[in-house]
């Protein structure tokens, strides 16, 4: 079964069948704000697509549930980003989104159990659950699910971490390419200066010195060999430097010693180095793509196994041409029919990081052993080869240094050796991972790097015609390998050196090195990178100095031009200068006055704003203080008064809440039934308690001295069976005839026989302060009221709720209208009085 590339734990039960992958149903449950959520790097739709891609590899997606804990959302994101996340999830479609206010994960567990109960008949076909939570590995739900044959995958983070590393590597490569482009642009700018010839010569000399220094570093690194213990019993030979002189071929299509190179200068070699750059083909393949490619090529590559490759290395008889020895591939014998069984994380207790497999340490050791053995083999083969000329060495050093990105060899690279004979055919071996048809498990992501030869002749080209049959179709028998090797090399007498190379296996590779992830750089590679970085820094410093010189020259020219312009202005007539000066002074004075006025206005505005801000702050502080006081008062009211919890569950808050609810029912006179306890317990916990969660609480209560009776559906603590009134089972035998008669007499005297609800009736009865009923507890009063309802003495009518609410605003409106009319009458009277006063004044005047 495929393992998620960024999963922390993968629990598998049962056999590894492809039917489960096709017919099985998958449920995804993501605790949103209990996992790292890098919104700045990835979008929500990208993360959801990653999870769906992983779930599709396990089976058919039946349910996708996301639970959002709003209490943790405030610590993770702002309200605006939370709304954006919520909107993107709703636009994605097909996702159940739930918002909760508690972080106890009870909602998540209940949703998982609901999914299992709905799809429990699919366990035989395969039922898989993906749990995304930072504490997913410690979830108590893992054990009961695996015991029932249900598969579960736990993901600590929904985002793959290796993508970040690939992006960082790509960014580094892009930065290096940009630096190279900037260097070329700076060189072109320097050519425009007066000292173009001198600068170009200095740059070429510096580049030659740097290239020689880099080649000297490569030679020192090739002389170093570090031997470490390999994961496999046999030694694996591997070349650390694919650009060394051992790979300089003298074939028809691969000749390093060109005819024109002997007559060229060092500068021409540097300028033409781009045409002879190394060809590096890097293919990054993820596990689903690689497995799909494997299934398509099973018919063509079914017979290619490591046993046939090893027999090819032992049975074939290559022929030496007398000039140089040949390099062949020899691959160790590995058995792919019986892969090791996967480890169970439940039994072993080991967890691996998203980028580290259990065999990563051993593979790192094997890669180190590859490098040391390859150096020893190459040193022994160089003693049998003729010494190259000085021109070939210089050309090889310049070819290595001319590449734009000089990077150390990767641990997952396969050096494809070319024939040194008379033919120019290229015969790369196919990847062993594509030829294995017996392994059922999918492959983890790996980086396969094919390093081709660094140089070719100008007339040679890589076409399908030049490739050997190995590149187009894989051979099925060792005889075809032998025929290929005999056809590619001319017939001549064999030597003891070629046989020893084949028997010892000069270049051998293992399947595990192809499947392992990228290893960290070795000390040799780090040294080489440091030297290359120092050289690049030196080049940048030189270019910066040249740029500074150019800037200084430009500044001098500008100063000279300004000086000439100033002299011309001074040569003007004195009257014009005086007029211009006066005008400028007047303008400056006006501008200063305007600026002062604007500053005064701004200061006044700032003062007003500061005063308003201070007032608002004082108001906010007062409001916050009032809110805090109200919250404290509410908290004190909600806290149970003088309740001492037993010592056996002091640390368990749920059991404490259950104990307080039972004690409260005891004081109110209610019988502690499931129906009465469940809503009150939810109010105490501040959440809605589901039935499945309540059953778990009951299981814990059994182990902490709570007596639970499923026949009567009651809960008591130890032997404190205080009884209590049950409104759902109201009976007359629980009360005396005098108490019942007192309530009936009250109803008959008041003539109130219809109530909106039982709650309103209970409140009305308690407010009457009857002598016998006032001595009863609240639960008993509720049961007594229920008896009158059952005996049809009193009836309930919910329509009264609507009438009481609608009549109140009508009465208010009538009162308002009356008040308005009275005000109008008063105004009219005032107007009349004013008119009378005016008439009296007029008469007096007459």
UniProtKB/Swiss-Prot annotation:
Region ranges (Disordered): 159-217, 254-276, 332-414, 459-501, 556-651, 803-846
Compositional bias (Low complexity): 163-217, 355-414, 483-501, 568-642, 811-846
Entry superkingdom: Eukaryota
InterPro entries the record matches: Sip5/DA2
Polar residues: bias regions: 459-482
Protein name: Putative uncharacterized protein DDB_G0288537
Organism encoding this protein: Dictyostelium discoideum (Social amoeba)
């Amino acid at each position: 079964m495929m393992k998620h590339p960024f999963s922390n734990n993968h629990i598998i039960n049962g056999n590894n069948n492809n039917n489960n992958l096709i017919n099985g149903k998958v449920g995804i449950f993501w605790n949103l704000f209990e996992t790292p959520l890098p919104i700045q790097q990835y979008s929500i739709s990208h993360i959801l697509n990653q999870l769906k891609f992983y779930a599709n590899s396990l089976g058919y997606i039946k349910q996708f549930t996301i639970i959002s804990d709003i209490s943790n959302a405030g610590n993770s994101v702002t309200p605006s980003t939370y709304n954006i996340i919520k909107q993107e999830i709703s636009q994605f479609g097909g996702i159940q989104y739930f918002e909760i206010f508690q972080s106890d994960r009870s909602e998540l567990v209940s949703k998982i159990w609901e999914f299992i109960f709905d799809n429990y008949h699919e366990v035989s076909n395969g039922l898989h659950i993906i749990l995304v939570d930072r504490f997913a590995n410690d979830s108590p739900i893992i054990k009961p699910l695996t015991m029932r044959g249900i598969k579960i995958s736990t993901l600590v983070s929904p985002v793959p971490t290796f993508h970040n590393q690939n992006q960082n590597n790509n960014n580094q490569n892009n930065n290096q390419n940009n630096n190279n482009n900037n260097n070329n642009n700076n060189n072109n700018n320097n050519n425009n200066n007066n000292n173009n010839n001198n600068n170009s010569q200095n740059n070429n000399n510096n580049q030659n010195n740097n290239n020689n220094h880099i080649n000297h570093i490569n030679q020192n690194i090739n002389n170093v060999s570090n031997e470490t213990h390999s994961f496999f019993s046999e030694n694996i030979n591997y070349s650390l430097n694919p650009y060394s002189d051992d790979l300089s071929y003298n074939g028809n299509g691969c000749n390093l010693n060109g005819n024109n190179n002997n007559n060229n200068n060092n500068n021409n070699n540097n300028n033409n180095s781009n045409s002879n750059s190394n060809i590096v083909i890097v293919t990054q393949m993820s596990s689903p793509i690689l497995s799909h490619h494997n299934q398509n090529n099973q018919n063509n590559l079914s017979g290619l196994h490591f046993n046939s490759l090893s027999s090819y290395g032992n049975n074939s008889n290559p022929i030496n041409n007398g000039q140089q020895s040949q390099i062949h591939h020899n691959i160790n014998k590995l058995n792919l029919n019986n892969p090791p069984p996967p480890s169970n994380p439940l039994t072993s207790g080991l967890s691996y990081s998203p980028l580290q497999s259990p065999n990563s340490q051993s593979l790192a050791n094997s890669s180190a052993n590859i490098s040391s053995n390859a150096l020893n083999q190459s040193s022994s083969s160089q003693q049998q080869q003729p010494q190259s000329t000085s021109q070939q060495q210089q050309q090889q050093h310049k070819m290595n240094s001319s590449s734009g990105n000089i990077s150390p060899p990767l641990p997952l690279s396969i050096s494809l050796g070319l024939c040194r004979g008379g033919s120019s055919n290229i015969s790369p071996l196919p990847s062993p991972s594509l030829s294995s048809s017996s392994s059922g498990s999918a492959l983890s992501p790996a980086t396969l790097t094919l390093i081709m030869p660094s140089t070719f002749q100008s007339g040679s080209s890589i076409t399908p015609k030049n490739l050997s049959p190995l590149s187009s179709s894989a051979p099925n028998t060792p005889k075809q390998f032998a025929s290929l090797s005999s056809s590619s090399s001319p017939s001549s007498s064999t030597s003891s050196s070629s046989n020893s190379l084949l028997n010892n296996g000069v270049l051998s590779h293992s399947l595990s090195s192809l499947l392992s992830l990228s290893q960290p750089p070795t000390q040799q590679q780090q040294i080489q990178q440091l030297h290359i970085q120092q050289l690049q820094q030196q080049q940048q410093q030189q270019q910066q100095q040249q740029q500074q010189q150019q800037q200084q020259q430009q500044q001098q020219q500008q100063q000279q031009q300004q000086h000439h312009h100033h002299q011309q202005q001074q040569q003007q007539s004195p009257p014009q200068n005086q007029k211009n000066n006066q005008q400028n002074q007047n303008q400056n004075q006006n501008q200063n006055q305007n600026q002062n006025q604007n500053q005064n206005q701004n200061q006044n505005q700032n003062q007003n704003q500061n005063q308003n801000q201070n007032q608002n702050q004082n108001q906010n502080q007062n409001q916050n203080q009032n809110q805090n006081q109200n919250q404290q008062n509410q908290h004190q009211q909600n806290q149970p008064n003088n309740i001492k919890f037993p010592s056996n569950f002091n640390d368990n808050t749920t059991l404490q809440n259950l104990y307080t609810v039972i004690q409260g029912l005891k004081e109110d006179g209610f019988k502690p039934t499931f129906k009465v306890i469940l809503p009150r317990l939810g109010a105490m916990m501040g959440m809605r308690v589901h039935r499945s969660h309540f059953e778990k609480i009951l299981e814990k209560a059994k182990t902490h001295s709570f007596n639970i009776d499923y026949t009567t559906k009651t809960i008591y603590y130890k032997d404190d069976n205080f009884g209590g009134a049950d409104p759902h089972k109201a009976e007359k035998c629980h009360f005396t005839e005098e108490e019942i008669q007192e309530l009936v007499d009250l109803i008959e005297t008041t003539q109130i026989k219809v109530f909106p609800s039982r709650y309103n009736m209970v409140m009305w009865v308690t407010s009457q302060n009857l002598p016998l009923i006032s001595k009863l507890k609240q639960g008993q009063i509720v049961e007594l009221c229920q008896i009158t309802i059952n005996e049809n003495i009193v009836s309930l009518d919910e329509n009264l709720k609507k009438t009481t609410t609608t009549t109140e605003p009508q009465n208010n409106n009538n009162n308002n209208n009356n008040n308005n009319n009275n005000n109008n009458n008063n105004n009219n009277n005032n107007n009349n009085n004013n008119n009378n006063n005016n008439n009296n004044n007029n008469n007096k005047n007459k």
